[in-house]
């Protein structure tokens, strides 16, 4: 009996752990065995990794309208099409349903990836193009270039990666449109440019893109937090550069791939807002978040914000988190103040304000968006009412002049009446009679 109970508990625990792990589907159009180090690094970070062939008819992203995977990696270097399962439309639906997508393509990329990039405002160069640099390259090859134009955003790329040295890159490039949700992670050198090996001579006179406006790795984050990564180098993730046993091992490439996948798969740079409360100052916590308050009440708003870093919750401390109190237009826009608390996983913020002298439906709203961080959009609606008849003060300060005039008129009237009543009337003068002769 005890052994059966132990087995049942063990199975239940394993299922819970399995459910908590993020699932990753790695899809390739070629032998995926050359990415064993990269895929193993995902497994070491507690991702549940599965692999598939890009034209496998049994592969699917959805079942009964539900997304089957949390994250998708698309590795394409030789196929001319993505197949029906992984078409640009299906990939966009996967992202819109809450999934994260990491696209890695080489110079022989299919047109479907270029179409997907155009949908995201990431414009990839033509097939058979390659990025070259005649001044910053690995020994013996102009198309294996050394790059140090790494993003300075600390929420995406760590200081350790930036200090590890230049990135080895061999592949295609792209440029970005005006979409504010996209940002470059790896730029070209001032001497880098795109070269089409099929249509151009050994040196391109009019390159498609060049210099620091040539982007090699870029990311996109939607307004609801879904993330997409795009890399133009399929070789960057191969064992040739990521395996410590390889003579071409690059620590900077290994760290770069780790940071990039951690961000795209939402293991870092994820903000979470919890415990949003509001109420009157000195009101018990259990009485907060009521549906109705009174105008001119002194109110307090509080919220806890945490930052996910390498899968661990940490306090997020900032001085630019703003709170708005809105009824059509903001009545207040104030900065939330970080307040010390006992929590080791989140930062407590507070703001104190006086409710407007205007009744109606109001909304507390926080809208916080920063590059590299998932957006925070929290709001709660409540009603502000007028004073009840027994809540008005006995005397209003603004009415003091009217009170004074009223009492002064009353006093003057009483004084007049008193004077009039107390004043003795004068005796009438009787004229004397004239003597008769």
Swiss-Prot record:
InterPro entries: Class_I_gatase-like, DDOST_48_kDa_subunit, OST48_MD, OST48_N. The chain crosses the membrane at residues 402-422. The gene is wbp1. Pathway: Protein modification; protein glycosylation. The cytoplasmic C-terminal domain contains a functional dilysine-retrieval motif, which is involved in the retrograde Golgi-to-ER transport of the protein. Glycans are attached at residues 275, 289. Pfam families: OST48_MD, OST48_N. Keywords: Endoplasmic reticulum, Glycoprotein, Membrane, Signal, Transmembrane, Transmembrane helix. Residues 20-401 are lumenal. Subunit of the oligosaccharyl transferase (OST) complex that catalyzes the initial transfer of a defined glycan (Glc(3)Man(9)GlcNAc(2) in eukaryotes) from the lipid carrier dolichol-pyrophosphate to an asparagine residue within an Asn-X-Ser/Thr consensus motif in nascent polypeptide chains, the first step in protein N-glycosylation. N-glycosylation occurs cotranslationally and the complex associates with the Sec61 complex at the channel-forming translocon complex that mediates protein translocation across the endoplasmic reticulum (ER). All subunits are required for a maximal enzyme activity. GO terms for cellular component: endoplasmic reticulum; oligosaccharyltransferase complex. Residues 423-437 are cytoplasmic. One of its GO terms (biological process) is protein N-linked glycosylation via asparagine. This is Dolichyl-diphosphooligosaccharide--protein glycosyltransferase subunit wbp1. Its main location: endoplasmic reticulum. Residues 1-19 form the signal peptide. It is a single-pass type I membrane protein. Component of the oligosaccharyltransferase (OST) complex. Belongs to the DDOST 48 kDa subunit family.
């Amino acid at each position: 009996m005890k052994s059966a109970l132990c087995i049942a508990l063990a199975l239940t625990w394993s299922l819970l752990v399995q459910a908590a792990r993020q699932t990753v589907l790695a899809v390739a159009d070629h032998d995926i065995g050359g990415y064993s180090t990269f895929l193993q690094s995902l497994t070491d970070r507690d991702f549940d990794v599965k692999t598939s062939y890009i034209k496998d008819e049994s592969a699917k992203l959805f079942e009964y309208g539900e997304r089957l995977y949390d994250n998708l990696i698309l590795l394409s270097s030789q196929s001319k099409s993505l197949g029906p399962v992984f078409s640009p439309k299906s990939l966009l639906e996967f992202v819109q349903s809450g999934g994260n997508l990491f696209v890695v393509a080489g110079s022989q990329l299919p047109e479907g990836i270029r179409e997907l990039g155009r949908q995201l405002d990431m414009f990839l160069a033509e097939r058979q193009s390659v990025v070259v640099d005649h001044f910053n390259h690995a020994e013996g090859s102009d198309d294996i270039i050394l790059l140090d134009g790494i993003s300075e955003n600390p929420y995406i790329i760590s200081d350790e990666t930036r200090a590890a040295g230049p990135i080895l890159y061999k592949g295609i490039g792209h440029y970005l449109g005006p979409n504010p949700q996209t940002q470059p992670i790896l730029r070209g050198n001032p001497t880098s440019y795109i070269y089409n090996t099929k249509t151009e001579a050994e040196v391109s006179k009019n390159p498609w893109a060049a210099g620091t406006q040539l982007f090699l790795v870029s990311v996109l984050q939607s307004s609801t937090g879904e993330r997409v990564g795009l890399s133009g180098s399929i070789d960057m993730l191969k064992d040739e550069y990521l395996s410590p046993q390889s003579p071409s091992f690059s620590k900077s490439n290994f760290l770069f791939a780790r940071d990039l996948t951690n961000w795209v798969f939402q293991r870092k740079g994820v903000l979470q807002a919890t415990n949003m409360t509001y109420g009157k100052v000195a009101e018990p916590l259990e009485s907060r978040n009521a549906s109705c308050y009174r105008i001119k009440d002194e109110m307090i708003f509080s919220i806890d914000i945490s930052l996910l870093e390498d899968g661990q919750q940490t306090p997020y401390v900032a001085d630019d988190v703003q709170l708005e109190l809105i009824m059509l237009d903001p009545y207040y826009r104030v900065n939330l103040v970080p307040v010390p608390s006992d929590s080791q996983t989140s930062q407590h913020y507070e703001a104190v304000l006086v409710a407007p002298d205007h009744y109606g439906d109001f909304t507390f709203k926080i809208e916080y968006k920063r590059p590299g961080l998932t957006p925070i959009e929290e709001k709660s609606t409540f009603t502000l009412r007028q004073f009840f008849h027994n809540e008005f003060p006995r005397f209003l300060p603004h009415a003091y002049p009217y009170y004074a005039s009223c009492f002064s008129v009353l006093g003057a009237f009483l004084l007049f009446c008193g004077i009039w009543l107390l004043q003795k009337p004068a005796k009438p003068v009787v004229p004397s009679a004239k003597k008769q002769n």
